[in-house]
Amino acid sequence: MMFNNENYKDYDQELWEAIQAEEDRQEHNIELIASENMVSKAVMQAQGSVLTNKYAEGYPSKRYYGGTEYVDIVESLAIERAKKLFGAAYANVQPHSGSQANAAAYMALINAGDTVLGMDLAAGGHLTHGSPVNFSGKTYQFVGYTVDKETEKLDYAAILKQAKAVQPKLIVAGASAYSRQIDFEQFRFIADQVGSYLMVDMAHIAGLVAAGLHQNPVPYAHIVTSTTHKTLRGPRGGLLLTNDEAISRKMNAAIFPGLQGGPLEHVIAAKAVAFKEALDPAFTDYARAVIANTAAMAEVFAKDDRFRLISGGTDNHLFLVDVTKVIENGKLAQALLDEVNITLNKNAIPFETLSPFKTSGIRIGCAAITSRGMGVDESRTIAHLIIKALVNHQQPEILEEVRYEVRRLTDAFPLYKKN
């Protein structure tokens, strides 16, 4: 064989050292970024398979290349498992990302310049829900809905009133930083009232939906988009679902040839593994634990007057905290916690007054620590460690104590046990 570099450790020491450093970071950091999780070794093995060698433009049994009989099996497995997992009639597992899935949904349902009603970024929406710096805001006329100023929860009556005034061609439901259950049936009612399509982006809550712990949007939305990582605990990638045959043809055409060429069949194989894992009853136990851990952690902040828990609580895998009583902004909080090996992100809060590069809040998610096996006791401990670090951010000796406690926790719950 022409290759003499079968072991990348020996062939590319510089790259190997960087990957080893990242593995060490993941092993010894408490990961609280709500959009991140830890995949199984089986998912990683599938993604590292020989399927990376195969080009397969098109769809199973309708390819533009030969030699696709086995990748057809792989992709068909992923499709059928996704359909079963979410109760959908049609699934497309080819999107490279959630953003690609959202772009395809827009292409399938509306035209450039059409009016779309989506969740405002500061209220908890996503860049692809109409941010002016994103393709969505540049291509379509997005109008943002927000949350109630008092409750910081979605106000469906207000959204209906806004929809009647705006008359959108499409309504987008779903969020990247909203800690409450979303009523997709209500959103479909609103869409029907104004003759609009409904698209649901369930990227953050897909694992909870799969486990039956959040209302399933598939019966209500014309198209559902998702990522396959986050709470679903699969590889980084996207997913499209629908119950409408005509729309399924449009969304498939939007992905290929509209947005993408050859699908990443090695990633699709990893998606198939993740879907099988999510169909296992043990995954429901995992999702329940995620919700319990998040609630336990949020409760600690709710009881501390120095912090403000956005919307007063959480129903899912994440929550937001206003930290400005103890530290200047979310950016500084994120950087400080990085120093003690707790990883999370700064985040705008509803009706934000600071720059999006600074923010008043932080976003905390518990999917990854739950994958490590941590429970409600550890979740409360982590919350207290975060508070201890933020309140004492100018006291190096206390920060060192926090760093030590973080290491004790991560050592007790290893990420990938060494063989």
Curated annotation (Swiss-Prot):
UniProt record, GO biological process: glycine biosynthetic process from serine; tetrahydrofolate interconversion
Pathway this chain belongs to: One-carbon metabolism; tetrahydrofolate interconversion; Amino-acid biosynthesis; glycine biosynthesis; glycine from L-serine: step 1/1
N6-(pyridoxal phosphate)lysine: modified positions: 230
Enzyme class: transferase
PROSITE patterns associated with the record: SHMT
Catalytic reactions on record: (6R)-5,10-methylene-5,6,7,8-tetrahydrofolate + glycine + H2O = (6S)-5,6,7,8-tetrahydrofolate + L-serine
Protein localization: Cytoplasm
Pfam families documented for this protein: SHMT
EC assignment: 2.1.2.1
Keywords, ordered alphabetically: Amino-acid biosynthesis, Cytoplasm, One-carbon metabolism, Pyridoxal phosphate, Transferase
Cofactor: pyridoxal 5'-phosphate
GO cellular component: a single term: cytosol
InterPro entries reported in the protein's UniProt record: PyrdxlP-dep_Trfase (IPR015424), PyrdxlP-dep_Trfase_major (IPR015421), PyrdxlP-dep_Trfase_small (IPR015422), Ser_HO-MeTrfase (IPR001085), Ser_HO-MeTrfase-like (IPR049943), Ser_HO-MeTrfase_PLP_BS (IPR019798), SHMT-like_dom (IPR039429)
Chain residues that bind (6S)-5,6,7,8-tetrahydrofolate: 121, 125-127, 355-357
Gene3D superfamilies hit by this protein: Aspartate Aminotransferase, domain 1, Type I PLP-dependent aspartate aminotransferase-like (Major domain)
Residues the UniProt record annotates as site (Plays an important role in substrate specificity): 229
MF terms in GO: glycine hydroxymethyltransferase activity; pyridoxal phosphate binding
Assembly behavior: Homodimer.
Family: Belongs to the SHMT family.
Protein role: Catalyzes the reversible interconversion of serine and glycine with tetrahydrofolate (THF) serving as the one-carbon carrier. This reaction serves as the major source of one-carbon groups required for the biosynthesis of purines, thymidylate, methionine, and other important biomolecules. Also exhibits THF-independent aldolase activity toward beta-hydroxyamino acids, producing glycine and aldehydes, via a retro-aldol mechanism.
Protein name from the UniProt record: Serine hydroxymethyltransferase
